[in-house]
Structures are given as structure tokens and as C-alpha cells.
Amino acid sequence: MKEKKTLEELIQDYNECKEIFGDADFTSIMIASSICDRYCERKQYDKASEYAKRNYEASLREYGVDEITTFDLLAKLIKCYEKAEDRESIDSVVDEYYRIREETLEIEIPDSTDDDILF
């Protein structure tokens, strides 16, 4: 059976993966999520929140507000803030999410016509 990596090894893997693929890559997100879980196990919720926030912001930037991954990462971030009893950060991140969501919905899509299509 494969041994579980140490927190330090996970952080090193995350930094290497982030450097190669970026922080919004699926592998980077999964490693950062594991780091977040480890910090939660140690009851270091401030560090867990830090990695959860990085993940959420990277997904929001790369995939947008309507992507299920972004929403799942937001839920994980809120859970970390709850464990840290940081109500202000919960309110802030939820307000930001809905503000961005509303802005996204307000973007007008130009009306297309068939006049410019060449056959």
C-alpha cells in the first residue's frame, strides 16, 4: 500500500505543479485541496483557508462563476471559514461571488443576424 505524502511533500508537489501548469490546472487544484484537508486535520484553519481561497480564486479566474468546480471550491472555502469561525470572510466571499455572478449575467450578447453569413 502506498504511503500518504507528508504535508511538506504535498506543498512541494503543489509548487512544482503550479509552476509548470498554473494554479488553475486540475492537478494543482487537487493537490491544493489535499493540502487544505491536511491543515484542517491539524486544526490550522487559517492555513487551510489560505489554500482553499487560492483554489477558489484560480478556478473563478480560469473557469468562471458558472463552473461547478468553482462552486464546489467556494463551498470548501466557506467550510474552512466556518471552522475558523470567520463570519466576516464568509460574508465577504459570498457577496463577491454573487456580485460577479450578477455582472456575468448582465453582459449582453450581441444580436446576431444571418446577413453576414456567406454561402
Where are these regions (language model features)?
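Intrinsic-disorder-linked linear interaction elements in eukaryotic regulatory proteins
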Residues: 1-119
